[in-house]
């Protein structure tokens, strides 16, 4: 997924849009970008300094969480827990809290999202990136930034507009990559704009909505986040739901003999908060059509699911002309 209201995307900047600036860094095995519009009347050096400072804060938060939760780092807290050197009860409050959130999401998605790998080891990578984005969003708001787009490996959280001075406020457009050809976009989904000042990005904590509840109705105005899971993005935290024994393990793996491939090559979910979007996208890839139907019954979100033959299943928000 790409924010196409972003100067780093080819042909991205919409006509009449304010000049955009972006900074990137690499963390959690992916590229993280922060894009902001230039401030009217502000010297370019001041804009650059403001963006550099904000990016440094975001990068520090991502690095801290990666150092704690990455299973690729042998000395991380998560690795110590997985090796049995540290019990979950002895782990940090944040480790326990995120595990508890992941367990709640497992219950709410009927097991399609899970914090345990098929080999039984705890793996919170399906939750940590969304949590990092949400925390970074809160920090950007605290820094006084009102208009921005934060993209971490295809998971996007926005605030405000790429053209805040435009009448009515233009939305950010999150481009969704075709899993069969990553050079091609299936379409773009509008995020933010109407939601300016309505809600702090990431304000809903992970798993905050009680089971059986739905987000308040009102597509568009509530959509601040969009996440994509599947073959076009990193999928090493996705395991096919409902299997006993070997299962498909991420898009880069053919999986063991007899493993069932997910029904969908890619799933994108737009929601009011990034954790909900990220978890539900992962859950639908893992759980297939049954989980998709359950998600649509329980949450007010927009979903675009891409089958392996290229067929699309889309909710009205993705079928609308503005999302094309």
Regions found by a protein language model. Give the residues of each.
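Mature catalytic core of soluble alpha/beta enzymes
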Residues: 1-324
């Amino acid at each position: 997924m790409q924010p196409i209201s972003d100067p780093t995307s080819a042909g991205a900047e919409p006509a009449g849009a304010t000049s955009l600036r972006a900074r990137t860094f690499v963390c959690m095995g992916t590229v993280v970008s922060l894009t902001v519009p230039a401030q009217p009347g502000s010297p370019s050096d001041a804009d650059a300094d403001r963006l550099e400072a904000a990016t440094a804060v975001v990068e520090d938060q991502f690095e801290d969480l990666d150092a704690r939760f990455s299973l690729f780092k042998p000395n991380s807290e998560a690795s110590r827990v997985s090796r049995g050197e540290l019990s979950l009860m002895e782990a940090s409050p944040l480790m326990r809290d995120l595990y508890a959130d992941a367990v709640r999401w497992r219950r709410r998605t009927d097991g399609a999202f899970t914090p345990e790998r098929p080999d039984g080891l705890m793996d919170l990578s399906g939750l940590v990136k969304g949590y990092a984005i949400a925390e970074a969003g809160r920090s950007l708001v605290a820094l006084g930034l009102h208009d921005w787009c934060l993209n971490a490996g295809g998971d996007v959280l926005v605030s405000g507009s790429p053209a805040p001075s435009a009448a009515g406020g233009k939305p950010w457009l999150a481009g969704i990559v075709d899993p069969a050809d990553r050079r091609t976009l299936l379409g773009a989904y509008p995020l933010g704009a109407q939601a300016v000042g309505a809600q702090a990005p990431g304000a809903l904590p992970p798993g905050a909505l009680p089971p059986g509840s739905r987000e308040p109705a009102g597509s568009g105005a509530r959509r601040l986040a969009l996440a994509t899971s599947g073959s076009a993005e990193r999928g090493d935290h996705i395991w096919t739901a409902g299997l006993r024994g070997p299962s498909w393990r991420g898009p880069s793996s053919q999986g063991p003999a007899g493993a069932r491939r997910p029904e969908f090559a890619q799933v994108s979910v737009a929601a009011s908060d990034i954790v909900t979007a990220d978890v539900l996208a992962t859950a639908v890839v893992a759980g297939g059509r049954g989980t998709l139907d359950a998600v649509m019954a329980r949450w007010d979100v927009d979903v675009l699911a891409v089958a392996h033959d290229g067929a699309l299943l889309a909710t009205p928000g993705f079928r609308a002309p503005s999302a094309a």
